[in-house]
Amino acid sequence: TRINSFLRFDSNLLNAFRSIGSIEGVDYVDLNYPEHFADYDIEVIKAKMEECGLRCNAINLRFRDKYIGGEFGNHEPAISQDAITLCREAADACRKLGGNQMIIWLGFDGFDYSFQIDYVSYWNRIVKAFRDVCDYSKVPVSIEYKPYEERVHAFIDSFGTAVSILHDVDRENLGVTLDFCHMLMKRENPAYSLALAARKNKLYGLSRR
């Protein structure tokens, strides 16, 4: 389960583990990086999860206001590199917690009006960044797409675009996480997208929130 829904009522991460662990049948959690790691050492997080009978399913990357001009595709090399470094740190955290995958949603990589960006250069920067992250990561890396928000138009906005990224990045440990609501926002056929991703063993996760 996602921890954020529990943190709305109690901002203490360790208390959230306790609440989730008390629910019968729930034994995996997703954590956001870096926000859920801000107040506790990773060993403390791991110990509390084990105490509550929980395991890490995935680490979800969360990029904040610093990346409002884009994460991987940002035209400023220093900011793009910072985004890559954040993913590397998240991969380390995922591995230490025994997580199954790292999920990357590039909410700020996109544009708000036509011709705002050089689309080809932007694409190439994103592909290069994913290669860097995948080559570093010891865990599977999954792309979660959304058609819009935080930008008017997300760069990786659809199943088709995500699959094209997978093709160009060309790494065995890169796949997709399909969010049911995001697919409906894009007016996609969720079952169709799921079947095509699974056909190539690239379906790394399915979210129904």
Label every PLM stretch briefly.
Residues 1-95, 171:
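N-terminal pre-domain/capping segments
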Residues 51, 55-56, 70-175:
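Active-site acidic/histidine proton-transfer and metal-coordination neighborhood
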Residues 26-34, 165-192, 198:
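Extended hydrophobic secondary-structure segments
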Residues 62-65, 107-109, 209:
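Short connector loops/turns at beta-strand edges and beta->alpha or beta->beta junctions
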Residues 1-2, 27-31, 54-61, 102-104, ...:
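Hydrophobic faces of well-ordered beta-strands that scaffold small-molecule active sites
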Residues 6-9, 30-44, 110-112, 149-155, ...:
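Acidic-and-aromatic substrate-binding clefts and catalytic sites of carbohydrate-active enzymes
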Residues 18, 131, 163-164, 191, ...:
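Active-site phosphate/pyrophosphate- and oxyanion-stabilizing loops and adjacent acidic/basic residues
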Residues 2-11, 74, 117, 152-160, ...:
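Gly/Pro-rich active-site loop or hairpin
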